[in-house]
Amino acid sequence: MLQKPKSVKLRALRSPRKFGVAGRSCQEVLRKGCLRFQLPERGSRLCLYEDGTELTEDYFPSVPDNAELVLLTLGQAWQGYVSDIRRFLSAFHEPQVGLIQAAQQLLCDEQAPQRQRLLADLLHNVSQNIAAETRAEDPPWFEGLESRFQSKSGYLRYSCESRIRSYLREVSSYPSTVGAEAQEEFLRVLGSMCQRLRSMQYNGSYFDRGAKGGSRLCTPEGWFSCQGPFDMDSCLSRHSINPYSNRESRILFSTWNLDHIIEKKRTIIPTLVEAIKEQDGREVDWEYFYGLLFTSENLKLVHIVCHKKTTHKLNCDPSRIYKPQTRLKRKQPVRKRQ
């Protein structure tokens, strides 16, 4: 349970109204919401308006303040379909002026509450300032950030760099564990990794929508899709988010994980340490370990719900731990002419 109450915006599925609710736990917010909307608490649950993710007590602390939630009763479902609409619309580079005007007209004429809600949500999401890039173009997006960040791409690039740097700091804490004899080799490997990371700008391009296609994890408009748990090929829930769209999505994106498929702390670093200790004249393939630790070769971008914290039980490839040893060809003796 949180010490300080978290404030959220809450709506019921079939209600045009939206209320502010505060609570220290998911259950407290649910109880207050049911009282407010006069709905039965039994069988009811909360989910994110953004993508339909169901809230649990473990996930509740990660939800940003003023996040928009939907209160569902038994049998109701919310798929976050507006996200799919928004993703489709954002594929166009020009503002959807005609579409906005048409939706506004439909909203004026529409009497059915559910259709009114859908049209209102559509207008809200189409009107978001996704295309804006600078602080001057979208000041609310930058609220709470240091003044040195003047562009959305710049901040998100920094955010990704910070994650990669934290992995490097973790590796850097291990030289003392390998013993005096192997420390020099460990520092050599670490130095090579640092040099590569600096040249790649700590792979910050992964979160930069302005980067080249092969070096970013999002669309040119800034849409990220969850790549699914480490043991699956894709995300069955089709989680997606655009942290470039608004401040709330930017904050929510910070809860997404860059998950190591082969685990960093349990497997990769211990294997690297052991390889350096036991190299016996062989050369450790630092580029292989670099790829596992710092690149999308072994990193998956996942929604917090798809981030499984169980032991992955995956190992490094034994054939790639050391560089192949080159054998010198023996010179054939020169035959004497008869």
UniProtKB/Swiss-Prot annotation:
Activity regulation (UniProt): Inhibited by DFFA (DFF45).
CIDE-N domain location: 4-80
Compartments where found: Cytoplasm; Nucleus
The keyword Transmembrane is assigned to this record: no
Keyword Cytoplasm: yes
GO cellular component terms, A-Z: chromatin; cytosol; nucleolus; nucleoplasm; nucleus; protein-containing complex
GO biological process, one term: apoptotic DNA fragmentation
Subunit structure and binding partners: Heterodimer of DFFA and DFFB. Interacts with H1-1.
Function: Nuclease that induces DNA fragmentation and chromatin condensation during apoptosis. Degrades naked DNA and induces apoptotic morphology.
Protein name, UniProt field: DNA fragmentation factor subunit beta
Organism in which the protein naturally occurs: Homo sapiens
